[in-house]
């Protein structure tokens, strides 16, 4: 893809949305990988009085895998967008990112952490917007 093509509004927003998802989900996912014990301890306390108290470990594992995969796909998708002008990988990254945010939102609601759930809404809007723009044909 040429620089002129990349700077066209649709292509540029596709690239930037995918880059945002890559940064957000890779950083968060890798934090969970490198501080798994700390995250598990915090989440165990967070969900202690919720219906999810017995499944914190599988939730953390599935959330970490989904989050890290979303970030990796978004990162690879951003590079693929810039080099080849195709956005299939970025679109899959956005799909997984959206799924991950919905998973987190459900967990926060079940833990009755309504402020925590509300703080996820802007991330959902970013993910949904990325899905929409990545689904658009390149100009």
Task: Locate the predicted segments by residue.
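Extended, low-polarity transmembrane helix blocks
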Residues: 1-31, 61, 65-139
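Solvent-exposed, well-ordered loop and adjacent helix/strand elements within mature globular domains
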Residues: 23-64
């Amino acid at each position: 893809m040429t620089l002129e093509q990349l700077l066209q509004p649709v292509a540029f927003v596709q690239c930037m949305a995918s880059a945002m998802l890559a940064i957000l989900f890779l950083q968060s996912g890798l934090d969970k990988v490198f501080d798994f014990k700390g995250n598990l301890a915090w989440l165990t306390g967070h969900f202690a009085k919720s219906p999810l108290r017995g499944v914190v470990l599988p939730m953390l594992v599935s959330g970490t895998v989904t989050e890290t995969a979303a970030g990796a796909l978004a990162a690879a998708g951003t590079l693929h967008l810039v080099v080849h002008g195709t956005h299939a990988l970025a679109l899959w990254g956005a799909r997984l990112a959206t799924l991950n945010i919905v998973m987190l939102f459900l967990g926060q609601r079940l833990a009755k952490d309504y402020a925590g759930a509300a703080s996820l809404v802007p991330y959902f809007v970013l993910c949904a917007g990325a899905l929409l723009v990545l689904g658009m044909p390149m100009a």
